[in-house]
Amino acid sequence: MATVPQQIPGVATNSFLSKERTIAAPGFNRWLVPPAALAIHLCIGMAYGFSVFWLPLSKALTGVAACTPEMGWFEELFASCNWRVASLNFTFTLFIVVLGISAALWGGWLERAGPRKAGVVAALCWCGGLALGALGISMHQLWLIWLGPGIIGGVGLGLGYISPVSTLIKWFPDRRGMATGMAIMGFGGGAMIGAPLAVLLMKHFSSADDPGVAQTFLALAAIYFVFMICGALGYRVPPSGWRPAGWTAPAGNASNTMVTQRHVHLNVAWKTPQFWLVW
């Protein structure tokens, strides 16, 4: 008769993606974390390079007129005319808006779930959004481009943006500015690498009646997924109470203390009118 394995009392069974499985072992080299963070930020940073797609997509249908300026945006979502550049560029607006909203909504979840799980979810959303965008281009449905790269991809941007920053700051409390700068450098450099790569891919896939953007989306999704998953699996978090050798936290002083002593939690802050005025 088969026996059912019993869980040892006091020992939790954690999944491979759980935060507990990412706690670094003693002697772990913290300088192995920045490459993992850069791998994710270089991929999602391509959001700033999407402008290379707008002109080819505005001429995607051969022998078809462009959508007229009088056409409403809702009608254009399902129209069979060539899309306007302004309508395509709205995808970037969705990127940035959803990035901020998702970072605010799921920032607390990231701290509980850990950067590895957040990195995997970011890869699925960002690359899945690109794949859905490729489908939208093939079907000539603008709403799928807004939904795929814009909204779903925007969620991947938000999670992919904050997880490297949060992790690096934990590993480099003595060099917070440098840690944040390394992560942001990757986000800004993503377009510098991704945009020329996208242009080369479009030239490779293009034909007389196809600008090759859909195939480029799929190729980028595959490339980015590999790098983002490798980056997410490379994440480690320091054990509780860890600090760099020879470093002691600076004593509190006027330059480091908060202006207010009320320490408003995010769950309370977002319910205040001041939060929305700043946002």
Kindly give the residue locations of the regions a language model identified.
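A structural feature recognizing the 12-helix transmembrane core of secondary solute carriers
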Residues: 1-279
